[in-house]
Amino acid sequence: MPAYLKDELSGFIPEEISSEIIKDVARGSSIIRLSKAEEMKTDEKKVPVMTSGAGAYWVGEGERIKTSGASWIYPKLKAKKLGVIIPVTKEKLNDTTIDVFSELRESIAEAFYKTIDAACIFGTSSPFETSLFGKIKTAGNVIPATGKIDIDVSDAMSKVEENGFDVNGFTATIGLKGTLRKLRDNNGASLFIEGTNQKEFYSQPIEFVRNGAWNKEKATIIGGEWKYSLFGLKQGIEFEILKEATLQNTLDSDGNPISLAEQDMIAIKATMRVAYLCVKENAFAAVVPADYDKDVTLSALTIGSLNLSPAFDKDTTEYTATTTAATNTITATATDSGATVEIKNGSTTVTSGSAATWSSGENTVTVKVTNGSKSKTYTVTVTKS
């Protein structure tokens, strides 16, 4: 007899659907498709990695074979919980559990693989200690773009090869495909092969991140020896039915967070546990924008003596403040002295260190930091009472 969702408000998604979701996640995630898979039975797993190999010796007749030691390290894969919440109509409670998750399978998988790629490749909203690109930067294996992508990628491959590794795959932004299609070798043959099941560049597989997770400001393409990129998965996807929550990060058509009780809805929370670790940063290299290292953050932002909410942090771009004064002095300082700062109160330009005049109600202050071709905008909504 089929189980109905109303009778199973929490537990594991049925195995036949869970396994299909995991397959969909693997198909949609570039980092999973390229990395070495590690099955995890617990939340932590030690992975033996050889740092120097054992040696072999020529042995004469009657001679004893020498022994040599190999050096090992044991980095840990640590599984972290990844969750997605999908609001649905309350009528879904009357459907079978299998039918509900069959219908939501694609949405759940897409949310998972986009978040996985963003976290593992670039460290975006990541619970992991480091990311693939973070490791590449630490190793100094970055090639600033020159406008000749074939040469730039060759130079990145050389970085890896100089360290004793071999590039056996790439991952890149989907926007690079058009450029790669135009590349030819000396004989006029295409350097990029767009096959039905496998795409290749420099005769190595290339995976394009098409799920919105790629950060073009950080890198254009990453290549490496992918057995040193480890992805761990703890089997099983859990679910929980939410009935009373307000979904702060899910907005209705009116722009307000969805209140499940008020709107006669439920939400399905699905969670899985995954782990990521790059064990040898020198095995990877990236082609980066020419000005990738240009800093476009602020080191300080003050509006008189007003308290910004949240407290100022260079990586936070949205703030609010309240004032009873007619004017307040705005001061904004770029972290990089070579960057320019443009301040506007509405459409009125304000020089840093000068006063802004407030209208009653909300006033929008924007602070734009520009460094080379990169820019970042901070916004403060100042309410004058």
How would you name each of these model-derived features?
Residues 16-27, 100-104, 108-116, 156, ...:
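Short, Φ-rich (hydrophobic/aromatic) sequence segments
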Residues 61-64, 203, 217, 353-355, ...:
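Glycine-centered loop/turn motifs
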Residues 41, 137-266, 270-272, 293:
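Extended oligomerization regions of viral-like shell subunits
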Residues 73-76, 84-162:
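Alpha-helical scaffold segments that mediate packing/assembly in large oligomeric complexes
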Residues 2-84, 283-284:
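Assembly/oligomerization interface modules of large self-assembling protein complexes
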Residues 287-293:
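Long, low-complexity, intrinsically disordered extramembrane tails
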Residues 293-385:
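Beta-rich interaction/scaffold domains
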Residues 55-58, 96-97, 179-182, 277-279:
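Short helix/loop capping segments that flank catalytic or ligand/cofactor-binding pockets
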